[in-house]
Amino acid sequence: MVTSCCSGSMSEAGHILDGLAEHARRASRSLARANAGTRNHALSEAAKALRVRSDEIVAANQKDLAALSEDRNAAFRDRLTLTPERVEAMARGLEDVAGLPDPVGRVLAEWDRPNGLHFRRVATPLGVIGMIYESRPNVGADAAALCIKSGNAVILRGGGESLHSARAIQAAMEDGLRAAGLDEACVQILPSADRALVGAMLQASGKIDLIIPRGGKSLVERVQREARVPVLAHADGLNHTYIHASADPAMARKILLDAKMRRTGICGATETLLIDAAIAPALLPLLVEDLAAKGCTFRADDRARAIVPTLAAASADDFDTEWLDAVLSVAVVDGVEDALDHIARHGSSHTEAIIAEDPEAAAEFLNGTDSAVVMWNASTQFCDGGEFGFGAEIGIATGRMHARGPVGLEQLTCYRYEVIGTGQVRG
C-alpha cells in the first residue's frame, strides 16, 4: 500500500504515517489470527510473483542505478544492484522462510501450581514493526517474509537510492498477500524518501511496536537518538579475523580471502586482520599477495609494515572504520589476550573469528570475545541468517536485550502467559 507524499513537513508526514500505522495495526490483527498454512501460502505466492515480475524489478533497479551519483563507490553500487539471479535468490529466500517451523503459538514453557492452575508461556507476534534500511533492496523482501511468517505487519523504509526497486518488490509482496486472502497492508512501504517520514516513524509510540534499523553508523545513531519506539539496533560490522600462531597457513589464506573479498560491502565482511607475531613474518606476505591480487588495499600498523613495507600506514581512525569496500586494516598482535584487547578497543560487538589449530587458544578467544557472533576456523561472512538456518534475517543485533546476532523468526515474537483453571478463585 503506497500513499502519496507531497511535503516534508512533520505534520503532513505524521498524518501519512498515522494512516499507514492504522492500516498496519488492523492487518497485524488479522495476520496474527491466520493459520500457518495461509501465511506460508502468501510467501509461496509472493515468490512466484517475484519470478514473474523479475524483468520489471530489474528494470526498476536500473532506474535507481542510473540516478545514483557518480561518487558512490563500487561496493555501494553492488549493494544496490539487482540482477535476475539476485531476484531469483530473493524468491528462494521467501520459499525457505515458508518452509521453516511456525514461530507463532509455540509453547515456550509450561508448569502446574499446587492449586491446580496450569500455566504456559506461548509465543506471539510483536504487532507492527518498522524496518529502516539503506541501499540493499533485497532487505525489504527478507524483512517482509520474516514478518509475514511471524504474524507481524511491517512498514518498510528503504534508502532513497532504492525507491524504484522497493516499489517493484512491494508489488510482488502484495500479489502474494492477495493470493492468500490476506490484507495487503501487512506489508507497506513509506511513499517517498522524505526524511520527515522517518522522523514520524521514530515518534510513532503506540502505533509501531518495534523499530529495526539496518544500515550505517549514522542511520543507527539517529534512530537510537530520536526514537520513542523500542529499537532493535544493528550496529557497524567492524569485524575481526585473528590468525593465531597455531593456524594452518593454507586454511588461514583461504578463510581470510573469503572473509574480506567474497562480498566487501556486506556487514559480515572482515574489516581488520589481526595476525600473531609468531606467524606474521612467514604468513603475512602471502596473505597480502592473495588479497592484493583481488584488488584489496591495506592500512597497516608499524609492526605489519616492518614485515611488508609496501603497506600503507594506518591512521588513528582506520581501526575504527567499517570499510564496506576492498580495504583491510592490519595489525600484528602478541597472542590471544592482545587480540582480545584490540577487539575490545575497536570492535562493534558484531562478528569475530579466530583461525587456530590449538583448541585452548580457540576456547580462550571464544569465551573472551563480547560480540554477538564468534567463529572458529570459519569466514565471518557466515554471519547471515540464511547460513544460521533462519531462512533469512532482518538484521544483526549487537545489543544485549531481547536478541543478539542474526534476527530471525524467533526474535520477531514475544509471548503471553495462558492460565488454565478448573474454577479456582483466590479469595
Curated annotation (Swiss-Prot):
Superkingdom of the source species: Bacteria
Listed name of the protein: Gamma-glutamyl phosphate reductase
GO biological process: L-proline biosynthetic process
Natural source organism: Gluconobacter oxydans (strain 621H)
Pfam family of the protein (one): Aldedh
Entry's family note: Belongs to the gamma-glutamyl phosphate reductase family.
E.C. code: 1.2.1.41
Compartments where located: Cytoplasm
Cellular component terms (Gene Ontology): cytoplasm
UniProt KW Ribonucleoprotein keyword: no
InterPro entries: Ald_DH/histidinol_DH, Ald_DH_C, Ald_DH_N, Aldehyde_DH_dom, G-glutamylP_reductase_CS, Glu-5-SA_DH, GPR_dom
Gene: proA
A molecular function GO annotation: glutamate-5-semialdehyde dehydrogenase activity
Annotated catalysed reactions: L-glutamate 5-semialdehyde + phosphate + NADP(+) = L-glutamyl 5-phosphate + NADPH + H(+)
